[in-house]
A protein has these predicted regions:
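N-terminal "mature head" segments of proteins
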Residues: 1-131, 143, 385
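Hydrophilic extracytoplasmic domains
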Residues: 18-23, 32-51, 104-105, 255-386
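Repeated scaffold domains used in trafficking and secretory/extracellular systems
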Residues: 29-39, 76-90, 116-129, 161-176, ...
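Short beta-strand elements that form the blades of beta-propeller/WD-repeat-like
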Residues: 39-57, 82-102, 122-144, 170-192, ...
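Hydrophobic/aromatic beta-strand positions that recur at structurally equivalent sites within the blades
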Residues: 61-68, 102-106, 151-153, 200-204, ...
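Short, surface-exposed coil-to-beta transition loops
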Residues: 145-146, 195, 223, 324-327, ...
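Acidic, serine/threonine- and glycine-rich low-complexity intrinsically disordered segments
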Residues: 163-324
């Protein structure tokens, strides 16, 4: 009797496993077929990149495409911590630990030379009508120095090089890729630490050519909070630095012509409240539209700094309330700010007009909560497609 009982249980488990396996494979194959359709991107308004963290093995992730009705279309990947996506108007580019994906009229998958576990930046390579990517690769195998691998295409050939430093922040203008490296020195007498930063410019062709443009010092350790943005021969980015009793949130100004670094305080906060004001996005917390530098903090306040006068002010507050440690992704396009609220209860995509400060659209997303309930993944990037 017991043998029959255990046999029935075993058969039930096998049948259930087969059904579950068939269902998962069948669902995934349908998604891939849909992505191969020529008009898949036609009604898609955004893509959100989800992934497990680097300490989760095996890795898992999703590129979640959202249509104009708020329906979510998840494409499963192997995941990439701090992964992101790029769009050149026709093609979406994203990655996981081992593969590059391009999606336009069809989905193409290309395997890289070695696994990468932490993303850093993805951008368009206008010279070759393709994309490039930078990874936070880690310490060199010989233990000497740090490495950030960069991948690109030249004449349809895959290329790779290594930037021999950890990237503090990065940005792009046309064919130029800008990166900042940092170094710390400690005074042997008083133990005081001082910080030196260097700005590098990389151009991609048959080979990658990287040169140092300028360097500068900072008495305190700043934390970059955004990509760099080019405007009128200057690079601007957001950072924060903690003093004795307060923290400053600053716009850093790198003058490419005169090789000088300056900063402008946007707002200050008490030291113990710093974490509450730290922005939610990993890299997309700042934006330039016309002659204004915009930023958003962790409490939903949007500020602007006039690049002509240097004056800063609070423009408006986000209508939807959220907590400092909620998952909120950010993107910008011209004079619009986009916010993706990412929860297991209800997710939504909101659009704000930077000129008026008004929320002009809210699109509730359907289907994301199932992904979050079944998988321990986190959102790392929002990309607006239209």
């Amino acid at each position: 009797m017991n043998k029959r009982y255990f046999m029935i249980i075993a058969i039930t488990i096998v049948i259930s496993s087969v059904i579950a396996y068939y269902y998962l494979v069948h669902t995934e194959s349908i998604r891939e077929k849909e992505m191969d359709e020529t008009d898949f991107l036609k009604d898609k308004v955004a893509v959100v990149y989800y992934s497990t963290t680097i300490d989760t093995r095996p890795g898992k992730g999703f590129a979640v495409f959202i249509d104009q009705n708020g329906e979510a279309y998840p494409f499963e990947t192997k995941g990439l911590e701090l992964g992101s996506s790029a769009f050149n108007g026709k093609t979406v580019f994203f990655q996981d630990e081992t593969n590059d994906y391009t999606l336009s009229t069809e989905l193409k998958k290309e395997k890289r030379d070695k696994p990468q576990f932490t993303g850093d930046y993805i951008g368009e390579n206008p010279k070759d009508n393709s994309f490039f990517s930078i990874f936070n690769t880690g310490f060199a195998e010989n233990g000497e120095g740090y490495e950030s691998d960069i991948y690109w295409k030249h004449n349809q050939q895959h290329k790779k090089d290594t930037l021999p430093f950890f990237i503090e922040t990065r940005g792009q203008h046309k064919n130029n890729i800008y990166t900042i490296s940092g170094d710390v020195t400690t005074d042997e007498k008083d133990g005081h630490e001082s910080y030196t930063f260097a700005l590098h410019k990389t151009t991609l062709s048959a080979e990658a050519k990287t040169v140092e443009i300028m360097s500068w010092n900072d008495s305190d350790e700043p934390l970059p909070l955004s990509h760099m943005h080019y405007f009128n021969n200057h690079l601007y980015y957001l950072d924060t630095v903690s003093r004795k009793e307060k923290s400053e949130f600053r716009m850093v100004d790198l003058d490419l012509k005169n090789k000088q670094a300056d900063d402008q305080i946007i707002f200050e906060t008490a030291l113990e409240e710093t974490d509450d004001f730290l922005p939610h996005s990993v890299h997309k917390n700042a934006h330039i539209d016309k002659d204004k530098f915009y930023m958003i903090d962790g409490k939903g306040n949007v500020y602007s700094t006039d690049l002509r006068t240097g004056s800063s002010k609070k423009e408006f507050h986000i209508k939807t309330e959220f907590q400092p440690h909620d998952f909120v992704e950010v993107d910008w396009r011209d004079h619009y700010l986009y916010l993706y609220f990412n929860t297991t209860d209800k997710s939504a995509l909101e659009t704000y007009d930077l000129t008026s400060g008004e929320r002009i659209d809210r699109l509730e997303i359907k289907g994301v909560e199932e992904i979050l309930k079944k998988n321990k993944v986190y959102s790392y990037d929002l990309l607006i497609l239209k």
